[in-house]
Amino acid sequence: MVFISLKGTSIYEICFFFVICAIKNLKSHLMSFLKDKILYEGLTFDDVLLVPAYSEVLPREVDLSSMFTRNIRINTPVVSAAMDSVTEDELAIAISREGGIGVIHKNMSIEKQASQVKRVKRAENVMIFDPITINLEATVAEAMNLMSEYKIGGIPVIDNNGILKGIVTNRDLRFENNPSRKITEVMTTNLITTNHQTNLESAARILQKHKIEKLPMIDESGKLIGLITYKDITKTKDRPNSCKDDKGRLRVAGAVGIAADTMERVEALINANVDAISIDTSHAHTKSVINILKEIKRNYPKVEVVAGNIVTSEAAKKLVDEGADAVKVGIGPGSICTTRIIAGVGIPQLSAIYNVAKAIEGSGVPVIADGGIRYSGDIIKAIAAGADSIMAGSLFAGVEESPGDTIIYNGRKFKAYRGMGSIEAMQQGSKDRYFQDIEDDIKKLVPEGIEARVPYKGTLAEVIYQMTGGLRAGMGYLGAKNITILKKEGKFVRITHSGIIESHPHDVSITREAPNYSRKSFE
C-alpha cells in the first residue's frame, strides 16, 4: 500500500493525481487487450521500398513470363479484372495480344459471356480448326450478320454434308444492296485450298503466290476442316509476345460466382473453349465457395480454376487442398472498394500477398495479387512479396478497349468505372459475389463499392508498355533477370511517412504529366 501525504496539496492536485493513476491503469489494461487481439502489423505497397542490388541485367533483357495458373503461362504478369467496366471481349483480346490475360466478367447472361469468350478465341488463330461457316441456302443478310457478330472478314460456304462450296468475303458484300439475295449468287467458287499437313510457312507462300487472304483446309472428300488467314499469320509475326494456347488462339478466362446457375455457366464457358474459370467472390474462405470449387473440379478435372479472394494463410492452404489451380489475393485494396470501411475487414495488400505466398510455397499454385496497384512500382513490390501476377481494374478502366461509358467532364475525357460491390453492379448480377444473391429489394442491398470515373488513358497497349517498362526497370535495379529470381531475391526496407513524401516529386509544381505518373494517385 502506498501512503500519500496530502498536507499542503490542493484538491485540484489531488484530483489530477488520481486521474493520472487511472489513465496509467487503463493504458495497462488496453496494452494487455491489444497484445491478445492484434496479430501483427499489416503493410501495403507505400510502406516499403525494394533494396537495389548488384546487377548485370539490363531492363530490356529481363524475362517477364510467369504462371497464371498451374498450367497456363502468361508472357506478361498482368491480368485484367473481372469487372463490368473493365473486361469484356475487346479488352480481353487486347491484353492477350500484349502477353497478359483478361477475365471476362459475369454481369451478363450466360449466353452473352460464352459468346464473348468465343470472340476472343476466334480473334486470332494460326489455323482455325472450327471456322464460322454458312450454308448454301443462306442470304446476304445472314452473312453480314455473322461477320458483324464475330468481327470476321470472310465465311466459308458449305453444303449439308460439310463439303466446301465457296467462300464469301466482305469484299463480295461491300456494294451488295439486296440483303435477301442468295449467298450462292455472290460467293467465290474458284478456290485455292490445302490440307491439314500444311505448315505456317507453306500457307504463307500459297497466300502470297495467289494473292488471297484466306486459305481453306479440306480433307480427301472435300469437307472443310479448317481455315488459315493472312491476317492471323501477320498478327503472329507482329506480336510474338501474345498469350496463346497450343492451337495458336488467344487465351481468356471467364468469371463465375456461387449463384444457382453457376454450373450451367461453367459448362457454357468450357464449351466456348475458355482457358480458365475464375470463381469471383469477395471472400473465398467459405463453405459455399469451396463446394463450388470441388464441384467444378469433379465435373471438369482438366479445367484450370482460379479461386478468390483471400488474404490469409489458412484460406490459401484450404483452397489449394481442394484443388484450386491459382489463388487470388485481396480483400478491400481496390480504389472503388469500400469493404474495409463498411465491413471492417481486410489485410493490407503487401502483407496479404506474403501471407498467402508463404503458406503455399512449393505447391505449384500461383498467386494473383488482386487490387491496390496504382503505379508500376507496386507491381514489382507485389511480385517480390510472392505474387506471380497482378490483377488490375482501375489501371485498365480508362483505356479505349474497356466497356465503360465515355464521359466529358470539365473539358477532359473520362471513362466510367465502378466496383462490383456498387449498388448498380450488384443489381446487374454481382450480388452473389457479396453473398447477397437472395436479396431482391434494392434498399436492402449493402454495397461494398462505389461508382467513379477515371481519366481516359489511350489504348491498352500504351498502358501495358508503361507498366511493364517500370517492372523491367525495377528488375534491372535488383539484378533479377526473371520473375522467379525477383520473388526469391527481392528484399524490402520499411519507410516512414516522410520517406513516402520524399519518394514522390516534391517542392515543385508539375507542369506536364508523365504517362506513367499522376499525383492524384498518390493523394
Give the label of every model feature segment:
Residues 104-109, 152, 156, 163-179, ...:
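Short beta->alpha transition motifs characteristic of CBS
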Residues 60-74, 81-83, 112-150, 157-159, ...:
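Bateman/CBS regulatory modules and CBS-like beta-alpha motifs in cytosolic regions of diverse proteins
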Residues 78-81, 102-104, 132, 250-256, ...:
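Hydrophobic faces of well-ordered beta-strands that scaffold small-molecule active sites
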Residues 102-109, 277, 281-285, 329-343, ...:
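Glycine-rich phosphate-binding active-site loops on the catalytic face of alpha/beta enzymes
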Residues 75-78, 127, 246-254, 297-311, ...:
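Short beta-strand/loop segments at the ligand-binding rim of alpha/beta enzyme cores
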Residues 110-116, 230-242, 263, 282-300, ...:
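Active-site-adjacent beta->alpha loops and helix N-cap segments on the catalytic face
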Residues 30-54, 135, 195, 255, ...:
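Alpha/beta catalytic cores of nucleotide-metabolism and tRNA/nucleoside-modifying enzymes
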Residues 91-92, 264-265, 269, 312-325, ...:
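Catalytic cores of alpha/beta
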